[in-house]
Amino acid sequence: HHIDRRMEQMRAEGVEFRVNQHVGVNVDAKKLLAEFDAVVLSGGSEYPRDIPAPGRELKGIHFAMDFLPWQNKKNAGDTVANQLFATGKNVVVIGGGDTGSDCVGTSIRQGAKSVTNFELMSQPPVEENKPLTWPNWPMKLRISSSHEEGAKREFSVVTKGFTGKD
């Protein structure tokens, strides 16, 4: 419901949404540039990247898109069977990007016993080194509102396998 409200607000402000377009196939790139002052290509993904590691098949290991939608449905007042909740659990989130951050925050808000976030990359510096990174995206430590809620973060972690008893 929140996303629907935001989209309606943006439509009312003049934003035009065209989804499932293949630029260069069913939409001409030159026509886009000629007709619009700004074009946003936002290629999000609902398809996860799996970790081909021993033990991956254990119960309790889930993709973000199997976990996050349940909370959105609950927030919208929907009741859905077989919901995944982090309440009372020790949660590890593998991945330090925006989706990982969403999983961290959702787990904390659901009352997880603990939340640890593993990031493959080494911890970047707090301050960016502009001469080193410009014109690329600056390498500096970013702390999302989800991380501010209390997750432990570990950097330079390579997932080699999973162990457990289902």
Where on the chain are the PLM-derived regions?
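N-terminal Rossmann-fold NAD(P) dinucleotide-binding loop
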Residues: 100-101
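Beta1/beta-strand and adjacent pyrophosphate-binding region of the FAD-binding site
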Residues: 85-97
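Short glycine-rich loop/turn motifs that provide flexible caps or phosphate-binding loops at active sites
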Residues: 41-43, 54, 63, 94-96
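A Rossmann-like FAD-binding core segment of flavoenzymes
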Residues: 2-49, 62, 72-81, 108-166
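Short secondary-structure boundary/capping segments
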Residues: 53, 82-84
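Conserved acidic residues
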Residues: 37, 59, 89
